[in-house]
C-alpha cells in the first residue's frame, strides 16, 4: 500500500519541486541555527552571534540589488546580544565595505541600529556629508555576508511559500499514514495482551532481583530519594539564584562545609529540605571537579547522591561556590555506624548498595546500555558515603574523582597525584607504584577502599555475636589521623589488614562477606575483585541456594573456617 501510494504521488512531487525551483531568487542566505539553547532546568541561554568581521576594506560592490561581502573572516561576537552590521560607503576615491559585530543598544557611526532584529542585512541609506552611506544590521548567523540593496530581494514570493506548503503536505502523507497504522496496531496488541493476563497471575509472579528494565527505571526516577526528582541533575544556568535559606551546619571537610537548607517552593510556606555544599573561593578547582562529575546525566543512579544544581554566589565573605544536592537525614555511614548496631539484613542492604554504586561509577555504560565515561572516586571512606532513609548507601564527595577519559595520556594520569585519605589508601597508592598504562588500576584502588568500608559495616553487625564500639579500619594500630608514612609501615612493611575474628565466620552470610572483602584488599591489585563482582556476591546472599556456585571467584573458604587477613 505504501509503495503504491509513493508511486502515485511521484509525478506530483516532480511538478511541485519544479515550481519551487522556478520561484527561488538568485541567491538565498543560508539557514542558521537558533541563537538560543535549552538549559537543563528549562530556561534559555543566549549564545554569542557569528558574524563576518573584516572592518573596513575596499569593495567592488555597487548599490544595485545585492552583493556578497567577500569577507573571509567569521568571528564570534564578544557579547551574546551583539548583532551583525555592514556599512557600505562610496566617495570620490573608492568604495569600501565594513562588516562587524555591534551592540544594538549603542549607536554606530552616529546612527541607531533600527533593524537589529531583522534576519537579513537590508541596506538603508543614511545622510552623511561628502559620501554615499548605507548601513544594515541583522540578527542571524553571518547575515552580514549577503548585502541587499533592493527591496525585491527582502521578501519571499507568496507563490514559493504556497508551493512549499503543498509539497511538504504531499511528502508527509505516506509516512504519516504508516505511523498512524503502526500506533493503532501496537495499541490493539497491548490491549489484547493485558486482557489475557490474569490479575492473580500478576500478583503471584515472583519479582526478580533487578533486571534491565528495573535499572533503567532507576535512572529515570529514584522514588526513594529524599528530594523530588523534578529538581534533580540540573545546572543552574540562569543568573537568578535559587531561593535557598541555609539552616544548620551538618558537616565540614577539607575543601567545603555542608549545610542543611530550605529550598523554597511557589509559596513562602512550602519548601524542600536540601543539602548545600559551600566551597570558598580558594577551592574553586575542587568545586569544578565535583560539578563536572555531577553534570554527567549518565551518572544518575539510586546509589549516587542526587544532584540539583551548581551556583556561583557573591557574599559578604567573598565569592563562594555552591553544590546543591538531596539531603539525607541519617548522615554519613561513619556517623550511622557509630550510633547504631546493624542487623544482618541491614549489612546486606548497605553492602550491596555500596557495591552497586561503585560498580556504576566504574562502568563504561549505563544499565540501559548508553555509553558512559568511567569514573574513579579516589577518596572512598565511610564519611564520604551517605545513608538513605531506606538504609541503602549513596556515594558523595567527588572533589578528588577522576574521569577515565581514553584521551588522557600516561603523563596526564601521572600528574593526577597521590590523593585520598591515608587510612584508606591502597598499597600501590601509598608507595606510588600504580600501573598508569592500565586505567583499571585506578578502579582497583577504589575496590581496596571499599573493602575497608565493608569491614567497618561488618564490625557493627550483631549477627557476628559480640559487637564492640565503632572503630575505623586499623583502629588503635595507627593514630586518629595517620599520615602516609605511618600507613606505609602498617600496610606495606607489616602487610597488615583490619582483624577478622574467628567467631565472625560462624554466620554463613558473614563468612561470604569476609571472604569477599579479603579478596578486595589483596596486596596485588590485579587479584582483587571488581565492584560489579562484589555487587553480584551480595545479590547471591539473598538466595543461599546459589552460594555454592558463585561465578566471580571459585576460591573457597578453607575447611578450618579461617581467612588470611594479611595478604
UniProtKB/Swiss-Prot annotation:
Phosphorylated on a Ser/Thr residue in the cytoplasmic domain. Coiled coil: none annotated. GO terms for cellular component: caveola; external side of plasma membrane; membrane raft; nuclear body; plasma membrane; transforming growth factor beta ligand-receptor complex. The modification Phosphoserine is found at residues 409, 548, 553. Residues 24-166 are extracellular. Keywords: Apoptosis, ATP-binding, Cell membrane, Differentiation, Disulfide bond, Glycoprotein, Growth regulation, Kinase, Magnesium, Manganese, Membrane, Metal-binding, Nucleotide-binding, Phosphoprotein, Receptor, Serine/threonine-protein kinase, Signal, Transferase, Transmembrane, Transmembrane helix. It is a single-pass type I membrane protein. Disulfide bonds join 51-84, 54-71, 61-67, 77-101, 121-136, 138-143. Glycans are attached at residues 70, 94. It catalyses: L-threonyl-[receptor-protein] + ATP = O-phospho-L-threonyl-[receptor-protein] + ADP + H(+); L-seryl-[receptor-protein] + ATP = O-phospho-L-seryl-[receptor-protein] + ADP + H(+). Widely expressed in adult. Expressed primarily in mesenchyme and epidermis of the midgestational fetus. Its EC number is 2.7.11.30. Its main location: membrane. ATP binds at residues 250-258, 277. It is an enzyme of class 2 (transferase). The keyword Signal applies. The chain crosses the membrane at residues 167-187. Its cofactor is Mg(2+); Mn(2+). Residues 545-567 are annotated as: Disordered. Gene3D superfamilies: CD59, Phosphorylase Kinase, domain 1, Transferase(Phosphotransferase) domain 1. Residues 1-23 form the signal peptide. SUPFAM superfamilies: Protein kinase-like (PK-like), Snake toxin-like. It holds the Pfam family ecTbetaR2. Belongs to the protein kinase superfamily. TKL Ser/Thr protein kinase family. TGFB receptor subfamily. Homodimer. Heterohexamer; TGFB1, TGFB2 and TGFB3 homodimeric ligands assemble a functional receptor composed of two TGFBR1 and TGFBR2 heterodimers to form a ligand-receptor heterohexamer. The respective affinity of TGFRB1 and TGFRB2 for the ligands may modulate the kinetics of assembly of the receptor and may explain the different biological activities of TGFB1, TGFB2 and TGFB3. Component of a complex composed of TSC22D1 (via N-terminus), TGFBR1 and TGFBR2; the interaction between TSC22D1 and TGFBR1 is inhibited by SMAD7 and promoted by TGFB1. Interacts with DAXX. Interacts with DYNLT4. This is TGF-beta receptor type-2. It comes from Mus musculus.
Amino acid at each position: 500500500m505504501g509503495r503504491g501510494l509513493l508511486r502515485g504521488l511521484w509525478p506530483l512531487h516532480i511538478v511541485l519541486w519544479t515550481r519551487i525551483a522556478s520561484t527561488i531568487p538568485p541567491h538565498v542566505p543560508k539557514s542558521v541555527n537558533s541563537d538560543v539553547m535549552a538549559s537543563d532546568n528549562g530556561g534559555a541561554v543566549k549564545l554569542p552571534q557569528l558574524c563576518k568581521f573584516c572592518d573596513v576594506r575596499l569593495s567592488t560592490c555597487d548599490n544595485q540589488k545585492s552583493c556578497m561581502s567577500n569577507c573571509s573572516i567569521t568571528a564570534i561576537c564578544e557579547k551574546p546580544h551583539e548583532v551583525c552590521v555592514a556599512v557600505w560607503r562610496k566617495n570620490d576615491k573608492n568604495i569600501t565595505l565594513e562588516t562587524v559585530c555591534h551592540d544594538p543598544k549603542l549607536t554606530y557611526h552616529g546612527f541607531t541600529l533600527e533593524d537589529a532584529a531583522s534576519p537579513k542585512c537590508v541596506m538603508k541609506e543614511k545622510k552623511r556629508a561628502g559620501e554615499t552611506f548605507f548601513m544594515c544590521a541583522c540578527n542571524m548567523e553571518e547575515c552580514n555576508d549577503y548585502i541587499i540593496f533592493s527591496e525585491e530581494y527582502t521578501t519571499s514570493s507568496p507563490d514559493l511559500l504556497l508551493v512549499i506548503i503543498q509539497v511538504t503536505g504531499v511528502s508527509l502523507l505516506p509516512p504519516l499514514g504508516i505511523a498512524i497504522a503502526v500506533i493503532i496496531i501496537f495499541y490493539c496488541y497491548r490491549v489484547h495482551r493485558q486482557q489475557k493476563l490474569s490479575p492473580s497471575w500478576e500478583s503471584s509472579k515472583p519479582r526478580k532481583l533487578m533486571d534491565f528494565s528495573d535499572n533503567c527505571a532507576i535512572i529515570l526516577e529514584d522514588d526513594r530519594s529524599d528530594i523530588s526528582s523534578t529538581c534533580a541533575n540540573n545546572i543552574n544556568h540562569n543568573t537568578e539564584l535559587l531561593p535557598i535559606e541555609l539552616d544548620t551546619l551538618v558537616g565540614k571537610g577539607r575543601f567545603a562545609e555542608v549545610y542543611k537548607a530550605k529550598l523554597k517552593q511557589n509559596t513562602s510556606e512550602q519548601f524542600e529540605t536540601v543539602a548545600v555544599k559551600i566551597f570558598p573561593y580558594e577551592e574553586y578547582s575542587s568545586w569544578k571537579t565535583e560539578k563536572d562529575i555531577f553534570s554527567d546525566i549518565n551518572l544518575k543512579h539510586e546509589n549516587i547522591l542526587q544532584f540539583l544544581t551548581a551556583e556561583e554566589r557573591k557574599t559578604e565573605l567573598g565569592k563562594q561556590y555552591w553544590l546543591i544536592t538531596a539531603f539525607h537525614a541519617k548522615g554519613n555511614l561513619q556517623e550511622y555506624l557509630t550510633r547504631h548496631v546493624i542487623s544482618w539484613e541491614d549489612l546486606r542492604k548497605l553492602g550491596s548498595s555500596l557495591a552497586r554504586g561503585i560498580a556504576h561509577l566504574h562502568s563504561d555504560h549505563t544499565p540501559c546500555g548508553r555509553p558512559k565515561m568511567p569514573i574513579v572516586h579516589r577518596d572512598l571512606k565511610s564519611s564520604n558515603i551517605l545513608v538513605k532513609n531506606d538504609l541503602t548507601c549513596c556515594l558523595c564527595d567527588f572533589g578528588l574523582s577522576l574521569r577515565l577519559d581514553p584521551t588522557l595520556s600516561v603523563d596526564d594520569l601521572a600528574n593526577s597525584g597521590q590523593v585520598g585519605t591515608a587510612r584508606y589508601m591502597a598499597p600501590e597508592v601509598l608507595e606510588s607504584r600504580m600501573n598508569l598504562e592500565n586505567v583499571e588500576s585506578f578502579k582497583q584502588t577504589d575496590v581496596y577502599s571499599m573493602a575497608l568500608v565493608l569491614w567497618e559495616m561488618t564490625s557493627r553487625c550483631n549477627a557476628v555475636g559480640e559487637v564492640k564500639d565503632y572503630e575505623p579500619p586499623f583502629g588503635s594500630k595507627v593514630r586518629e589521623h595517620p599520615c602516609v608514612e605511618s600507613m606505609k609501615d602498617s600496610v606495606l612493611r607489616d602487610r597488615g589488614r583490619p582483624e577478622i575474628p574467628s567467631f565472625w565466620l560462624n554466620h554463613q552470610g558473614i563468612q561470604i562477606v569476609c571472604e569477599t572483602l579479603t579478596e578486595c584488599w589483596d596486596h596485588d591489585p590485579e587479584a582483587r575483585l571488581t565492584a560489579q563482582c562484589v555487587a553480584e556476591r551480595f545479590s547471591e546472599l539473598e538466595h543461599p541456594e546459589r552460594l555454592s556456585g558463585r561465578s566471580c571467584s571459585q576460591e573457597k573458604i578453607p575447611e578450618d573456617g579461617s581467612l588470611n587477613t594479611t595478604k
